[in-house]
Regions:
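Extracytosolic ligand-binding ectodomains
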Residues: 1-451
Length: 451
């Protein structure tokens, strides 16, 4: 949430927001009320979030008048998607979830007698920061004021200045770089920043008895931030880290793998194989890294860990499943809350494309819904008005990914992490299974599968 920001809702809408996440689809009368200029109402929402070792109190005050001229026609929502490039394996599933949300939202609007529709305009960024900015500028030229995405922190960092300067509201489903946690800007993120994932990774690895880790990581906003967060948290536990940074555009990782292989060999002689590991902080190129690691005996004999860039990554199992299964590649990713909404979306995406969605399919679905509710709440298509009311809506919304409470920087206020591993199926193929769960409140790992 944003410091000092006042959020506008009518008294009828304020009451509705307390339950809107649970009753979407059964609130037809709400929109009729929202189309009539209401009296100004001030509401205050205070949420106390306990996240060991810190307890955070988040307060949002709403004092803006909603209403005015009734919205009509198509309301455009931009979507900066990784339909190709280094995160294409994620983009396909997220695009599917977004289309499901768009259809459901428009059915909701139709049933409630509204004169406007919610239109998603998808643009492929190819996971390239420069192209993401070009696509945002193109959307802005077409009058788009609200944008979903992009997927990567590198892209978000590159578009942030333009979005802030031009008052375009951007809500990312998956950007996690801690450096982008900035209060009172025009950027929200429906995931926690990587200070949380760094803590989860350090606990996961240290609890396995590992004291020395080679980190092979992508040299961009996301990779740099996550490597730093992990190294800081792991260092607190007495662990040693050797970071090896690579160019995000690289296709040959022999230099990095050779360095890692030598360091692992040195450590194994000094401390034993059980005390060393590799942490891979990569996107889809993790498949290439794993394939090329076949040439390095020390790396193949070592347990690997991954992150949200590899967890449930379809390219990893299709291109390098045998290597990933051998080294395990235990990968952390923000955990959705299991609920009927979660299960419904999971089955819908699976039926549409034959793949289970990952967490960011759930968060992008929730972004679409919360933006639709925000538009209806304010009664205007205006980024600043939506920005003001958005934290209160998220604080009272329970979606497919769970409760969407935000912190002072406009990012999700923490949560647990699922830990995924690659296994060989009875059919001889490879798949991801949830192997463990990291609980943030207790700072503990619970295993669901044999290690």
């Amino acid at each position: 949430m944003r410091n000092g920001k006042k959020l506008g809702v009518s008294s009828a809408v304020a009451a509705l927001l307390l339950v809107v996440g649970l009753v979407i689809g059964a609130v037809g009368g709400y929109f009729v009320t929202a189309s009539v200029p209401p009296a100004t109402t001030t509401i205050t929402t205070t949420q106390i979030v306990t996240q060991t070792p810190v307890t955070t109190t988040v307060t949002a005050t709403a004092t803006v008048t909603a209403g005015g001229a009734r919205l009509t026609g198509e309301i455009p929502i931009g979507a900066l998607m990784s339909l190709s490039g280094d995160l294409a394996s994620f983009g396909k599933r997220e695009s599917t979830a977004l289309k499901i949300a768009e259809k459901e939202i428009n059915e909701w609007l139709r049933q409630s007698g509204q004169a406007w529709t919610f239109r998603i305009i998808e643009e492929d960024t190819a996971t390239q920061p420069a192209l993401a900015l070009q696509k945002l500028q193109s959307l802005a030229a077409r009058g788009v004021k609200l944008v979903i995405g992009p997927l990567s922190s590198g892209e978000l960092r590159n578009i942030k200045g333009y979005a802030d300067s031009n008052r375009i509201l951007v809500v990312s489903q998956s950007s996690t770089a801690p450096a982008l946690a900035v209060p009172d800007d025009y950027v929200f993120r429906l995931v926690p920043d990587d200070n949380f994932q760094g803590k989860a990774l350090s606990k996961l690895i240290s609890s396995a008895g590992v004291s020395h880790v080679v980190v092979i990581y992508r040299g961009d906003a996301w990779g740099d931030g996550l490597q730093e967060a992990f190294a800081r948290e792991y260092g607190k536990l007495g662990g040693e880290v050797v970071p090896i940074r690579y160019n995000p555009d690289a296709k040959d990782f022999s230099a990095e793998l050779s360095t890692a292989n030598a360091k692992i060999g040195e450590w194994v002689k000094s401390y034993g194989a059980s005390k060393v590991a590799v942490l891979d902080i990569s996107f889809d190129e993790a498949a290439l890294i794993l394939l090329q690691a076949k040439d390095y005996a020390n790396l193949l004999a070592t347990r690997w860990y991954g992150t949200d860039g590899t967890a449930q990554n379809s390219r990893v199992i299709s291109d390098a499943g045998d290597v990933a299964e051998k080294v395990k590649l235990y990968s952390t990713i923000f955990a959705a809350t299991s609920s009927p909404k979660y299960e419904k979306l999971r089955s819908q995406v699976k039926a549409a494309i034959g793949e289970d969605p990952e967490i960011y399919s759930y968060t992008i679905y929730d972004i679409a819904w919360t933006l639709a509710i925000a538009i209806a709440t304010t009664g205007v298509y205006d980024a600043t008005a939506i920005k003001q009311v958005y934290p209160t809506i998220c604080a009272n919304y329970f979606g497919a990914s769970g409760w969407t409470l935000l912190n002072e920087a406009g990012d999700r206020a923490g949560g647990d992490y699922d830990i995924w591993a690659v296994v060989k199926t009875p059919q001889g193929t490879y798949d991801w299974v949830k192997a463990a769960v990291y609980n943030f409140a207790s700072d503990s790992v619970t295993w669901l599968q044999p290690t």
